[in-house]
C-alpha cells in the first residue's frame, strides 16, 4: 500500500477529521489564552486570522459528519483549502505590517463583519479587536505570532495538498482470503 493510498483511507475515517478539529481547538485555545490570560490585545488582523482558523474547524466538522461520503469529504477539503489559503494571505499581510511599517499601509481600526454575522457584537470577548497590528507583542523561537500563523496555515495547505492528491489513489482492500 502506497503512502497516498494510506492517506486516502485515513481521510475517509472520522479520526482524521477529528484530529484536524482538535488541532484547531488547540490553536483557538492558545489565542484565547494569549488574549485573556497573558493580556495580549488582539488586533484586527489577529481576529481575521482567528476567523480563518475557525473556517478550518468548520471544514473539519463538515468532513467529520460523513467522511466516507465523497460529497462531505470534498466539501470539507474545499473548506479546509479556502480557509487555509485565506488565513495564509492574512498572516503574510500581518507580517508585512509588522516588519515593513508604513503610514500608508495599516490595518483597519475596527473589525468589519457582514451585517448578517456581526461576530464582534455577538461574541465580543472573542472577536473584538483593540490591539495594534504593527506591534510585535510576543515571540517564540524568534518568530512573531503572525509568522507562526504563516507556518501553521502553510502547513495546513501542505497537508491538504497531500490528502487531495491521495484522493486519486485507490484504497487497497485487505485480501479476504488471508
From Swiss-Prot:
GO molecular function term, any single one: electron transfer activity
Keyword vocabulary terms for this entry: Cell inner membrane, Cell membrane, Chaperone, Disulfide bond, Electron transport, Membrane, Oxidoreductase, Redox-active center, Transmembrane, Transmembrane helix, Transport
Periplasmic face of the membrane: 34-51, 93-147
Record membrane topology: Multi-pass membrane protein
Transmembrane feature ranges: 17-33, 52-67, 75-92, 148-166
Localization, UniProt: Cell inner membrane
Matches recorded under Pfam families: DsbB
GO BP annotation list: protein folding
Topology feature Cytoplasmic, residues: 1-16, 68-74, 167-178
An annotated GO cellular component: plasma membrane
Primary location class: membrane
Disulfide bridges in this chain: 43-46, 107-133
Family statement drawn from the similarity comment of this UniProt entry: Belongs to the DsbB family.
Entries under HAMAP family matching the protein: DsbB (MF_00286)
Protein role: Required for disulfide bond formation in some periplasmic proteins. Acts by oxidizing the DsbA protein.
NCBIfam families: PRK01749.1
Name of the molecule in the record: Disulfide bond formation protein B
Originating organism: Vibrio parahaemolyticus serotype O3:K6 (strain RIMD 2210633)
The organism's taxonomic lineage, starting at the top: Bacteria, Pseudomonadati, Pseudomonadota, Gammaproteobacteria, Vibrionales
Amino acid at each position: 500500500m502506497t503512502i497516498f493510498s494510506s492517506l486516502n483511507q485515513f481521510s475517509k475515517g472520522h479520526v482524521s477529521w477529528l484530529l484536524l478539529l482538535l488541532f484547531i481547538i488547540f490553536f483557538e485555545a492558545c489565542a484565547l489564552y494569549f488574549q485573556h490570560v497573558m493580556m495580549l490585545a488582539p488586533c484586527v488582523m489577529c481576529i481575521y486570522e482567528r476567523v480563518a482558523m475557525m473556517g478550518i474547524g468548520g471544514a473539519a466538522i463538515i468532513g467529520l459528519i460523513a467522511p466516507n461520503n465523497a460529497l462531505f469529504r470534498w466539501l470539507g477539503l474545499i473548506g479546509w483549502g479556502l480557509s487555509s489559503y485565506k488565513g495564509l494571505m492574512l498572516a503574510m499581510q500581518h507580517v508585512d505590517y509588522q516588519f515593513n511599517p508604513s503610514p500608508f499601509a495599516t490595518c483597519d481600526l475596527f473589525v468589519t463583519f457582514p451585517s448578517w454575522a456581526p461576530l464582534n457584537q455577538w461574541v465580543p470577548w472573542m472577536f473584538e479587536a483593540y490591539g495594534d497590528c504593527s506591534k510585535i507583542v510576543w515571540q517564540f523561537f524568534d518568530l512573531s505570532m503572525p509568522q507562526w500563523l504563516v507556518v501553521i496555515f502553510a502547513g495546513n495547505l501542505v497537508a491538504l495538498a497531500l490528502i487531495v492528491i491521495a484522493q486519486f489513489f485507490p484504497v487497497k482492500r485487505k485480501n479476504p482470503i488471508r
